[in-house]
Amino acid sequence: MIVRSARRRGLAPVLALCTVLPLGLAGCQKEKTPEPEIPWGLPIDGPALVKLGPGDPKPSFAAAFSARGRNLDESLAQSLSWFQKPSSKQFFPQKNGTTAENVATWEQASAGVVAFRQILAESSSATDFQTRIEQVFDIWQSVGKDGTDRQVLFTGYYSPEFKGSRTRSGRFQHPLHRRPADLVTDPVTGEPKGRRLADGSVVSYATRGELARSGELAGAELVWLESSLDAYIIQVNGSARITMPDGSNMFVGYAGKTDRPYFGLGRSMVDAGLLTEDRLSLASIRSAYRKDPAAVEALMERNESYVFFTEYDGSNWPAGSLGVRVTEGASIATDKKIFPRGGVTLVNTRTPTISRGPENFSRFMLDQDTGGAITAADRADLYMGIGATAEILAGGQYFPGSLYYLILKPEYASQYPLPANGR
């Protein structure tokens, strides 16, 4: 995931490491007290999505239609392959946030991908496409960070590559761990519940620091890495390709996490005075770690959450939380407790470029991943790709925007059956 939270996959965003909470700006009139800025990522108590009615303005699909291409085609195919698996049915019907309202049944969600792909291929123009989509789909919009403003913060994540060893040796002294048998998670949502004791009761899991000092994970090491920061980054991302000393590759993915709270390392480093907010990036975090690894390791413990991993064959690397390959510029990660899996979304925001500065970004993307830091209706992570360039782009992705879900109207679900082979 990939660098993001963890899943999975979930994968995790670079800015889960690097971002700090927004700061309020002082008002111009001294006699007025400015309203405090509402931080991003607060959990909701109510609906996560609002269905746009006949009188509501609809988002334009023109720019996203023009930007369609091979990556969108591949991402659609990956979602279809997931819906082809019987296990996908357990995640539906999708409730609307914490309410009892249904957003989508499995039949609507799976047929929606088929319908979208067919209409995309058959439409002669953006206008024709918009008309046909609005005829058979309902458009739902994220409620945003306070349940009413409908603004979503879009960060970025990528697939990191690291060096490591299956055995502890030389410079490889920092482990990732397998999932412990006593970790309890919700079988449908994957939400961590804690640790099951011998008497059957469930209690909160140990913190990151407690796990490190107790040694209770000894013997559960999956792979050894060059630094504790490498291990931490993979935990935040939820997935990685790790090159062994003999040149072979090992692929690791999210296998669960503890129920302890997440706290961003970047925020901790700013609070501690190791970095300033205007110079906050993954590169600056790495630089600070090289100068004083002990200080940064101490701040890592403010993030009490701990992520566990499993090895997989890598044939579908980089895989998101659905177990299918995520696609650059066409896959997003969201909170799967409140948003439906596998379906088509419309993302309207801005995104960085290597040389031209930020640009408007309007794309159809498939919701195929999740992340440890992506835990609310106002947060989503855009998948930027693999390697160094993707890391730079992911590190610069921090822009608000709008997030829409295209949900097939129930009366059309039977008209768009899944293809036999998932493609």
Task: Give the role of each language-model region.
Residues 8-19:
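Sec-dependent N-terminal signal peptides
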Residues 24-27:
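C-terminal motif of bacterial Sec signal peptides marking the signal peptidase cleavage site
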Residues 313-423:
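C-terminal soluble interaction/assembly domains
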Residues 34-38:
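C-terminal segment of N-terminal export signals and the immediately downstream linker at the start
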Residues 40-313, 320-324:
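Secretory/export targeting leaders with adjacent low-complexity proregions
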Residues 29-32:
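Bacterial signal peptide processing site
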Residues 1-8:
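N-terminal secretory signal peptides that target proteins for export/translocation
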